[in-house]
Amino acid sequence: MITLTGHTLTIEEMKRLLLEGEGVTACPNSMQKVAECREVVEKIVEDGKVVYGITTGFGKFSDVLIQKDDVKALQHNLIQSHACGIGDPFPEEVSRGMLILRANTMLKGVSGVRPLVVNMLLEFVNRKIHPVVPQQGSLGASGDLAPLSHLALVLLGEGEVFYKGKRVHAMVALTEEGLEPIELEAKEGLALINGTQAMTAQGVLSYIEAEATAYQAEFIASMTIEGLQGIIDAFDENVHKARGYKEQVEVASRIRDILHDSKLTTKQGKLRVQDAYSLRCIPQVHGASWQVLNYVKEKLEIEMNAATDNPLIFDGGEKVISGGNFHGQPIAFAMDFLKVGMAELANISERRIERLVNPQLNDLPPFLSPEPGLQSGAMIMQYAAASLVSENKTLAHPASVDSIPSSANQEDHVSMGTIASRHAHQIIQNVRRVLSIEMICAMQAAEYRGIENMSTVTKSFYHQGRQQVPSITNDRIFSTDIENIAYWLKTNYSIKERLDVNAAL
């Protein structure tokens, strides 16, 4: 059970919450702050003060005063009218993440909701009732209005949820769990939907998968080095310390550890003086992607604990301030950066695939075919990798450079952060498939070299891979092989976390 405080949530905790289904509870001190802040909102309503989002309309209607008797209707109308999401739903892990992050930000005690609302969000998390939230429709400022409205709907007993493996109406799940839908009161609708939790939840899942994929890329690249009898000198510690980037030094160190007892690597000048860049520059390129990942993780952990709704309430109600923390620009930039960093791992992987299958670049059978000419072997797998890499280049175009005004030009600059976050996740799926193709080719090359000559670690990794796909002894439908390896990489926890060379043994 992970305790939410509004201040301390980490990526490591989100891994447990999203991937392992761990439950959550609220810090009592934080809940006390929620209750105290709520008293301020109720006094504002009682006194008839004019405060945006509490006693006024929204967006362009911010100058429209709402009567006390209409305050509840205002919140309900807000949720229904803003539930304009379209397209396929976010993965369940993302909608679960949205619930967690929305609760966490409310626990900062500046949003003005009742403790009841926070508790309801936590009930949904712990009972694994996950909102069906369409992926498209958010501009990323005023936060993720459309996606979060679909989240808010289910608290009211409306909309759909994923529950026990099925997609059902929210009331089906609430009834089975013995829960009553809530009725929103002043400010609560706005507090639920005015924030960056959709782009951030998708960003967190994307980061978790990207981190795992980056580690896996080092295993796979190491096996390719063996298949091509790569020069190990290029990974010498002195070379990388001379550059000074810690991530580059770390990648080189991990690859040295993986290959330390390999009989398939060579020394400088033995077979050739230098390797091509796709082998020789693995630490420099992969290390640069790790720099991106480290940046993204830092920004996500800030946003996971950020108050991003509007207005915010401070100093016991002395200050009720309309600001712009809902603007998703920091996450939009981070997700666009993640797109570029991950796409580059696929770029260099595809070039290693080419070196594995091109007979002009190695002494292996052409396209790793068991019978060159009669059988095409891995020829078209390289085409598939090239296609995915090309698609990534389109997806990597920054979403954050775009902005379209909305709400009659009141919201005249937006982040498009949710588009960036969604595209980052698509790129990661493509990267994983490119790496799967490289792994299939690298395993085949290793067989031609003699698997008994592989390092202890890569040999173990090879045998795990061969449990997913057989050796290429005849042409077959390789699409299935690629998807099998990709699924294994996505779900295999022994290589999903930090690269421990002993974990593969």
Swiss-Prot record:
Contains an active site 4-methylidene-imidazol-5-one (MIO), which is formed autocatalytically by cyclization and dehydration of residues Ala-Ser-Gly. There is a cross-link at A141-G143 (5-imidazolinone (Ala-Gly)). One of its GO terms (biological process) is L-histidine catabolic process to glutamate and formate. SUPFAM superfamilies: L-aspartase-like. One of its GO terms (molecular function) is histidine ammonia-lyase activity. It catalyses: L-histidine = trans-urocanate + NH4(+). Pathway: Amino-acid degradation; L-histidine degradation into L-glutamate; N-formimidoyl-L-glutamate from L-histidine: step 1/3. It is an enzyme of class 4 (lyase). The modification 2,3-didehydroalanine (Ser) is found at S142. Its EC number is 4.3.1.3. Keywords: Cytoplasm, Histidine metabolism, Lyase. The keyword Transcription regulation does not apply. InterPro entries: Aromatic_Lyase, Fumarase/histidase_N, HutH, L-Aspartase-like, Phe/His_NH3-lyase_AS. The keyword Membrane does not apply. Belongs to the PAL/histidase family. This is Histidine ammonia-lyase. The gene is hutH.
